[in-house]
Amino acid sequence: MSQPLLAVNGLMMRFGGLLAVNNVSLELREREIVSLIGPNGAGKTTVFNCLTGFYKPTGGTITLRERHLEGLPGQQIARMGVVRTFQHVRLFREMTVIENLLVAQHQQLKTGLFSGLLKTPAFRRAQSEALDRAATWLERIGLLEHANRQASNLAYGDQRRLEIARCMVTQPEILMLDEPAAGLNPKETKELDELIAELRNHHNTTILLIEHDMKLVMGISDRIYVVNQGTPLANGTPEEIRNNPDVIRAYLGEA
Protein backbone atom coordinates (compact mmCIF):
# COMPACT_ATOMS: atom_id res chain seq x y z
CA MET A 1 0.00 0.00 0.00
CA SER A 2 1.29 3.48 -0.87
CA GLN A 3 2.40 5.92 1.80
CA PRO A 4 -0.33 8.29 3.02
CA LEU A 5 -0.41 11.78 1.59
CA LEU A 6 -1.43 13.15 5.00
CA ALA A 7 -0.86 11.29 8.26
CA VAL A 8 -2.19 12.40 11.65
CA ASN A 9 -0.97 10.45 14.68
CA GLY A 10 -2.07 10.89 18.28
CA LEU A 11 -3.40 14.42 17.78
CA MET A 12 -4.14 16.23 21.04
CA MET A 13 -5.64 19.68 21.61
CA ARG A 14 -6.19 21.08 25.07
CA PHE A 15 -7.79 24.40 25.98
CA GLY A 16 -6.93 24.96 29.63
CA GLY A 17 -8.57 22.08 31.47
CA LEU A 18 -10.63 20.98 28.45
CA LEU A 19 -9.23 18.17 26.31
CA ALA A 20 -11.02 18.92 23.03
CA VAL A 21 -9.15 16.38 20.88
CA ASN A 22 -7.80 13.23 22.47
CA ASN A 23 -5.43 10.92 20.56
CA VAL A 24 -7.03 11.26 17.12
CA SER A 25 -5.24 9.54 14.24
CA LEU A 26 -6.20 9.42 10.57
CA GLU A 27 -4.69 9.01 7.13
CA LEU A 28 -5.49 10.41 3.71
CA ARG A 29 -4.21 8.75 0.56
CA GLU A 30 -4.06 10.42 -2.82
CA ARG A 31 -7.44 10.97 -4.49
CA GLU A 32 -9.44 9.64 -1.54
CA ILE A 33 -12.62 11.15 -0.18
CA VAL A 34 -12.56 10.67 3.59
CA SER A 35 -15.21 11.91 6.02
CA LEU A 36 -14.80 12.86 9.67
CA ILE A 37 -18.12 12.59 11.49
CA GLY A 38 -19.47 12.75 15.01
CA PRO A 39 -22.07 14.52 17.16
CA ASN A 40 -22.05 18.29 17.58
CA GLY A 41 -19.18 19.26 19.85
CA ALA A 42 -17.22 16.07 19.07
CA GLY A 43 -14.06 18.01 18.14
CA LYS A 44 -14.24 17.70 14.35
CA THR A 45 -13.66 21.37 13.52
CA THR A 46 -10.93 21.52 16.16
CA VAL A 47 -9.15 18.75 14.24
CA PHE A 48 -9.49 20.82 11.04
CA ASN A 49 -8.12 23.87 12.85
CA CYS A 50 -5.08 21.88 13.97
CA LEU A 51 -4.45 20.47 10.48
CA THR A 52 -4.61 23.89 8.82
CA GLY A 53 -2.53 25.92 11.27
CA PHE A 54 -5.31 27.80 13.05
CA TYR A 55 -4.39 25.98 16.26
CA LYS A 56 -1.04 24.64 17.38
CA PRO A 57 -1.71 21.09 18.62
CA THR A 58 -0.90 20.23 22.22
CA GLY A 59 0.48 16.87 21.11
CA GLY A 60 0.78 14.42 18.25
CA THR A 61 2.12 14.74 14.72
CA ILE A 62 0.72 15.91 11.38
CA THR A 63 2.76 15.09 8.27
CA LEU A 64 2.21 15.95 4.61
CA ARG A 65 4.39 13.67 2.47
CA GLU A 66 6.39 13.08 5.68
CA ARG A 67 6.95 16.82 6.23
CA HIS A 68 5.73 17.98 9.63
CA LEU A 69 2.96 20.59 9.68
CA GLU A 70 2.23 20.95 13.38
CA GLY A 71 2.96 24.50 14.50
CA LEU A 72 3.33 25.92 10.97
CA PRO A 73 1.30 29.06 10.17
CA GLY A 74 -1.86 28.59 8.15
CA GLN A 75 -0.61 30.54 5.13
CA GLN A 76 2.43 28.29 4.82
CA ILE A 77 0.29 25.16 5.07
CA ALA A 78 -2.00 26.56 2.36
CA ARG A 79 1.00 27.22 0.10
CA MET A 80 1.98 23.58 0.63
CA GLY A 81 -1.36 22.54 -0.85
CA VAL A 82 -3.72 22.05 2.11
CA VAL A 83 -6.73 24.39 1.97
CA ARG A 84 -10.15 24.50 3.61
CA THR A 85 -13.64 25.92 3.73
CA PHE A 86 -15.49 26.83 6.93
CA GLN A 87 -18.80 26.01 8.63
CA HIS A 88 -19.90 29.57 7.98
CA VAL A 89 -19.13 30.97 4.53
CA ARG A 90 -16.09 33.24 4.58
CA LEU A 91 -15.92 35.34 1.43
CA PHE A 92 -14.71 38.86 0.80
CA ARG A 93 -18.30 40.01 0.75
CA GLU A 94 -17.68 43.52 -0.58
CA MET A 95 -15.58 42.23 -3.49
CA THR A 96 -16.94 40.86 -6.73
CA VAL A 97 -17.20 37.16 -7.39
CA ILE A 98 -14.14 37.08 -9.65
CA GLU A 99 -12.13 39.31 -7.32
CA ASN A 100 -12.60 36.69 -4.61
CA LEU A 101 -10.90 34.14 -6.85
CA LEU A 102 -8.09 36.49 -7.84
CA VAL A 103 -7.30 37.42 -4.25
CA ALA A 104 -7.18 33.73 -3.35
CA GLN A 105 -4.38 33.23 -5.88
CA HIS A 106 -2.23 36.07 -4.57
CA GLN A 107 -0.03 33.80 -2.45
CA GLN A 108 0.50 31.45 -5.41
CA LEU A 109 1.76 34.15 -7.80
CA LYS A 110 5.47 33.52 -8.37
CA THR A 111 6.34 37.15 -8.97
CA GLY A 112 7.76 39.58 -6.47
CA LEU A 113 6.84 43.12 -5.50
CA PHE A 114 9.43 44.56 -7.88
CA SER A 115 7.93 42.69 -10.83
CA GLY A 116 4.47 43.86 -9.82
CA LEU A 117 5.48 47.50 -9.60
CA LEU A 118 7.14 47.39 -13.01
CA LYS A 119 4.43 45.18 -14.52
CA THR A 120 7.07 42.95 -16.09
CA PRO A 121 6.12 40.33 -18.70
CA ALA A 122 6.36 37.64 -16.01
CA PHE A 123 3.95 39.55 -13.78
CA ARG A 124 1.47 40.16 -16.60
CA ARG A 125 1.65 36.49 -17.58
CA ALA A 126 0.98 35.38 -13.99
CA GLN A 127 -1.96 37.78 -13.75
CA SER A 128 -3.38 36.46 -17.02
CA GLU A 129 -3.07 32.86 -15.82
CA ALA A 130 -4.80 33.74 -12.55
CA LEU A 131 -7.65 35.37 -14.45
CA ASP A 132 -7.98 32.33 -16.72
CA ARG A 133 -8.13 29.97 -13.73
CA ALA A 134 -10.75 32.16 -12.07
CA ALA A 135 -12.92 32.22 -15.20
CA THR A 136 -12.56 28.46 -15.66
CA TRP A 137 -13.78 27.74 -12.15
CA LEU A 138 -16.61 30.26 -12.34
CA GLU A 139 -17.81 28.54 -15.50
CA ARG A 140 -17.56 25.14 -13.79
CA ILE A 141 -19.74 26.20 -10.84
CA GLY A 142 -22.19 28.11 -13.02
CA LEU A 143 -21.29 31.61 -11.83
CA LEU A 144 -19.39 33.02 -14.81
CA GLU A 145 -22.30 35.31 -15.70
CA HIS A 146 -22.13 36.68 -12.13
CA ALA A 147 -18.37 37.35 -12.25
CA ASN A 148 -18.75 41.07 -11.61
CA ARG A 149 -21.53 40.76 -9.06
CA GLN A 150 -20.79 41.54 -5.41
CA ALA A 151 -20.25 38.28 -3.54
CA SER A 152 -22.63 39.24 -0.74
CA ASN A 153 -25.49 39.42 -3.25
CA LEU A 154 -25.20 35.77 -4.29
CA ALA A 155 -27.71 33.20 -3.09
CA TYR A 156 -26.45 31.12 -0.17
CA GLY A 157 -25.87 27.98 -2.24
CA ASP A 158 -23.90 30.01 -4.79
CA GLN A 159 -21.76 31.44 -2.00
CA ARG A 160 -20.98 27.89 -0.86
CA ARG A 161 -19.86 26.92 -4.37
CA LEU A 162 -17.82 30.10 -4.71
CA GLU A 163 -15.99 29.27 -1.50
CA ILE A 164 -15.03 25.86 -2.93
CA ALA A 165 -13.92 27.48 -6.20
CA ARG A 166 -11.83 29.96 -4.21
CA CYS A 167 -9.96 26.99 -2.76
CA MET A 168 -9.61 25.19 -6.09
CA VAL A 169 -8.05 28.09 -7.99
CA THR A 170 -5.01 27.63 -5.73
CA GLN A 171 -4.62 24.10 -7.17
CA PRO A 172 -4.48 22.28 -3.82
CA GLU A 173 -3.55 18.68 -3.16
CA ILE A 174 -5.93 18.42 -0.20
CA LEU A 175 -9.28 20.19 0.13
CA MET A 176 -10.89 20.16 3.57
CA LEU A 177 -14.63 20.90 3.58
CA ASP A 178 -16.28 21.83 6.87
CA GLU A 179 -20.03 21.10 6.62
CA PRO A 180 -20.35 22.17 2.96
CA ALA A 181 -23.97 20.95 2.72
CA ALA A 182 -25.16 22.98 5.71
CA GLY A 183 -28.12 25.13 4.68
CA LEU A 184 -28.41 23.64 1.19
CA ASN A 185 -31.65 22.35 -0.27
CA PRO A 186 -31.81 18.80 -1.77
CA LYS A 187 -31.07 20.01 -5.32
CA GLU A 188 -28.05 22.00 -4.14
CA THR A 189 -26.84 19.05 -2.06
CA LYS A 190 -26.99 16.77 -5.12
CA GLU A 191 -24.99 19.33 -7.10
CA LEU A 192 -22.46 19.47 -4.26
CA ASP A 193 -22.16 15.67 -4.32
CA GLU A 194 -21.41 15.80 -8.05
CA LEU A 195 -18.90 18.64 -7.61
CA ILE A 196 -16.98 16.80 -4.87
CA ALA A 197 -16.79 13.68 -7.05
CA GLU A 198 -15.51 15.77 -9.96
CA LEU A 199 -12.82 17.39 -7.81
CA ARG A 200 -11.46 13.94 -7.03
CA ASN A 201 -12.01 12.24 -10.38
CA HIS A 202 -10.97 15.02 -12.75
CA HIS A 203 -8.73 17.28 -10.66
CA ASN A 204 -6.94 14.62 -8.57
CA THR A 205 -7.89 16.39 -5.36
CA THR A 206 -7.83 14.52 -2.06
CA ILE A 207 -10.78 15.51 0.12
CA LEU A 208 -11.39 15.46 3.88
CA LEU A 209 -15.01 16.20 4.72
CA ILE A 210 -16.89 17.12 7.88
CA GLU A 211 -20.60 16.71 7.27
CA HIS A 212 -23.85 15.95 9.12
CA ASP A 213 -25.77 14.92 5.98
CA MET A 214 -25.39 11.16 6.34
CA LYS A 215 -26.81 10.40 2.90
CA LEU A 216 -24.08 12.55 1.35
CA VAL A 217 -21.36 11.09 3.60
CA MET A 218 -22.33 7.46 3.00
CA GLY A 219 -22.71 7.95 -0.73
CA ILE A 220 -19.45 9.70 -1.48
CA SER A 221 -16.87 8.59 1.10
CA ASP A 222 -14.19 5.97 0.55
CA ARG A 223 -13.56 5.78 4.29
CA ILE A 224 -15.05 7.38 7.40
CA TYR A 225 -13.56 8.30 10.77
CA VAL A 226 -15.88 8.82 13.73
CA VAL A 227 -15.06 10.87 16.83
CA ASN A 228 -17.13 11.37 19.96
CA GLN A 229 -16.30 13.87 22.70
CA GLY A 230 -12.91 14.43 21.07
CA THR A 231 -11.98 10.74 21.15
CA PRO A 232 -11.75 8.27 18.23
CA LEU A 233 -14.74 5.94 18.13
CA ALA A 234 -14.48 4.01 14.86
CA ASN A 235 -13.15 4.06 11.31
CA GLY A 236 -13.91 2.03 8.22
CA THR A 237 -15.88 1.90 5.01
CA PRO A 238 -19.34 3.47 4.84
CA GLU A 239 -20.91 0.03 5.19
CA GLU A 240 -18.81 -0.79 8.26
CA ILE A 241 -19.67 2.53 9.89
CA ARG A 242 -23.36 2.21 9.05
CA ASN A 243 -23.50 -1.12 10.89
CA ASN A 244 -21.25 -0.22 13.84
CA PRO A 245 -23.39 -0.31 17.01
CA ASP A 246 -21.17 2.19 18.85
CA VAL A 247 -21.57 4.68 16.00
CA ILE A 248 -25.31 4.11 15.84
CA ARG A 249 -25.62 4.87 19.53
CA ALA A 250 -23.30 7.88 19.50
CA TYR A 251 -24.27 9.57 16.26
CA LEU A 252 -26.32 7.96 13.56
CA GLY A 253 -29.11 7.15 15.97
CA GLU A 254 -29.58 10.88 16.59
CA ALA A 255 -30.55 11.57 12.99
From Swiss-Prot:
UniProt: ATP binding residues: G38, P39, N40, G41, A42, G43, K44, T45
Any one Pfam family match given in the protein's UniProt record, by short name: ABC_tran
Segments forming domain ABC transporter: 6-254
UniProt entry keywords in alphabetical sequence: Amino-acid transport, ATP-binding, Nucleotide-binding, Transport
Keyword GTP-binding in annotation: no
Domain of life: Bacteria
Gene Ontology BP annotations: D-alanine transmembrane transport; L-alanine transport; L-isoleucine import across plasma membrane; L-valine import across plasma membrane
GO MF entries: ATP binding; ATP hydrolysis activity; L-isoleucine transmembrane transporter activity; L-phenylalanine transmembrane transporter activity; L-valine transmembrane transporter activity
InterPro entries: AAA+_ATPase, ABC_AA/LPS_Transport, ABC_transporter-like_ATP-bd, ABC_transporter-like_CS, BCA_ABC_TP_C, P-loop_NTPase
NCBIfam families xrefs: PRK11300.1
Record's function text: Component of the high-affinity branched-chain amino acid transport system.
Protein's name in the database: High-affinity branched-chain amino acid transport ATP-binding protein LivG
Encoding gene per record: livG
